[in-house]
Amino acid sequence: MSSWGDSLKISVFGESHGKGIGVVIDGLPAGVRLDMEGIYLQMSRRAPGKDKTATPRLEKDIPQVLSGLLDNTTTGAPLCAVIENTNTRSGDYGNIMSCPRPGHADYTGNIRYGGFNDISGGGHFSGRLTAPIVFAGSVCRQILAEKGIRIAAHIASIGNVNDIRFDPVDIPSELIDRLNVSTFALIDQSAEEKMRAEVEQCRMNLDSIGGTVECAVTGLPAGVGSPMFYGIEGVISSIVFGIPAVKGIEFGAGFDAAKMKGSQDNDEFYYDGDTVRTRTNNHGGILGGISSGMPVIFRAALKPTPSIGKQQNTVDLVKHQDAKLEIHGRHDPCIVPRAVPVIESAAAVAVANLMMQVNKL
C-alpha cells in the first residue's frame, strides 16, 4: 500500500522514470490559504542535482496542483499535485533488468509483483517518491504553524561525524527558522566541512555512506495521541519507515534509556506559571503514546545509498546463476542531507493527522 493515514490520508503515486509522480491529500480543512513559495522552498531543499553530496540528476520538482486548491486556498476537496519527471535516463539500468542490485528492492519487488515492476531508477521504490511526501508535509506544516506547532530537523551524523543534538527542553525559534531554509542543515555549522569530506571520500571510492537525522516538533499541546497501537511513536514511525533508506528510529533518550536507572530516566514535573513542564526530556515529549507538551524529539537512521560504483556480487534471475554487477546511472553518495526535509515533512503529516484525531486542527 502506498496510502497512509485515517483522519488525514495521503496516497503517493508514480515511478522514478515514469511521466510523473504525485500525491493526493484527503481530509484537509477548507479555507486554508497556502504560501506556494514556501512550498517551493521546501521542495527545492530536497530536489536533486544541487550539491556534491547528491545525485547529479537535475529535476526542478515544481508541483502542479490539479485539484483541491482555488486561489491558493484549500477547497476541502482532495488536494492532488503532480511533479513531472524531466531528466530520466532509463538506459543506465539495462544491465540490471535480470540482475537485482544488492541493497535495493529489485529482488523483493520482482518476487512480490511477478517481474512486472518497473526497476528503472528504482521505480516506485525510489527515493524520488519522497518529493510528493515533501509537498504533502509542506502543506501540513503551514496548517500546523497556524496552531503554533513548528517542525525542524538537522543532520545528526554522517558516518562517524556528529552534529550536536537539540536541547531537548528548549529549541529556539531562531534555530528552527535557520534549519527550515537550509540545504545542509546543522546546529553546529562547524561540522559541515568534516561531513562533506566524509561524503567526498566515499564518492571518490565509488562508495556511499549513511547517517542519522534528528527531528523536533515544538508547540504540540499536551493530550494529543492515543495509548498502545495508535500512540504518537507508532504513528510517526509508520510514516517515517515509508521513506526509503530509513532503517531505525528512536524517541527521546531512545536506546540510551536502556542503560539508565529509573531515577535517571524519569523526567520530573514542575509548574512554569500555569503550564506543567519537565526539567529534562528523556521521554521525548511522549508518555503513554500521548504528548506531554514538551518538544517531541526523534532520530531516524538512514542506511548508505545502495547504488554504488564498485563491482558487486549478485544473481541472474533469468540464467539462474551467480553474476557480477557494476551499477551505472546517477546516484547520491549520501542521502542524508536531502532526507532532512523529508523527515520534517513526514513528521508534519503525522502530527496533522494526530491533531485531527482529537479535533484540534
Task: Pin down the residues of each PLM region.
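Internal helix-turn-beta structural module
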Residues: K9, S307-L361
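Glycine-rich, mobile lid/loop segments that gate access to catalytic sites or pores
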Residues: R112-M228
